[in-house]
Each structure stands twice: as structure tokens, then as C-alpha cells.
Amino acid sequence: MTEALTHVIDHEGQGTPATVRLTVLPSGHTRVGVTDPDPRVPPLLPGPAGVTDESGRGLALLDAPAPRWGVEQRGDRRAVRCEPAGEPPLDDVRTPAAPAVRSGR
């Protein structure tokens, strides 16, 4: 999601309000979203960026680790969301045990 946040700063300006939302889905997986005040929705995958291009890679970079993603217009705002691949449902995540405490000698 750093790409989505960087996009807000680069194209809307530093200090532009953006919302980052983490949602736990009924499946236990996580959805991550960034909403910003730009209502324009970019082409979903505009094609590969050139080696020397300084922009145009954001959605392609998002597509690699998150095969489930999208961009939608919400009135005068845009929302980019993704669901990272391979993420275990929360009920499968194990909490590590507390470290052992030794008494001093």
C-alpha cells in the first residue's frame, strides 16, 4: 500500500488527507485500502513502465503480491484496495508464548 500512499503525495501533494483502512473479512483474511480525494480512476493495468520511468508502476506492483485488488470511484474520492495473497486467516495465526523468565543468581 506504500505505492498507493506515495501516489497521493506525488499527485495530490504532501499533507493531502488520505484514509488507510484495514478490514478483517469473514474469511479471516485482511483487506487493505487507501482512499484519497482524487476522483479519477486510472487504467487498471496501463502496461509495463519503462526501465527509466519514474511513475506508472503502482498498480502493477500492487498486482504482484495481491491478486485480489481494485480501484473504485466513491463520489469525489478514489479508493484502492487489496487482499494480500497467501495470508493465513487470523484464526490460523499462532501467538508466540511469552519468553521464559529466569531468576537471577
UniProtKB/Swiss-Prot annotation:
User: Could you tell me which Gene3D superfamilies the record lists for this protein?
Assistant: Histidine kinase-like ATPase, C-terminal domain
Q: Which GO terms describe its molecular function?
A: sigma factor antagonist activity
InterPro entries recorded for this chain?
Anti-sigma-factor_SerPK, HATPase_C_sf
Q: Composition bias, kind Basic and acidic residues: at what positions?
A: 72-81
Q: Which GO terms describe its biological process?
A: negative regulation of DNA-templated transcription
- Give the region (Disordered) as residue ranges: 29-55, 72-105
Name this polypeptide is given: Uncharacterized protein SCO4941
Q: What is the originating organism of this protein?
A: Streptomyces coelicolor (strain ATCC BAA-471 / A3(2) / M145)
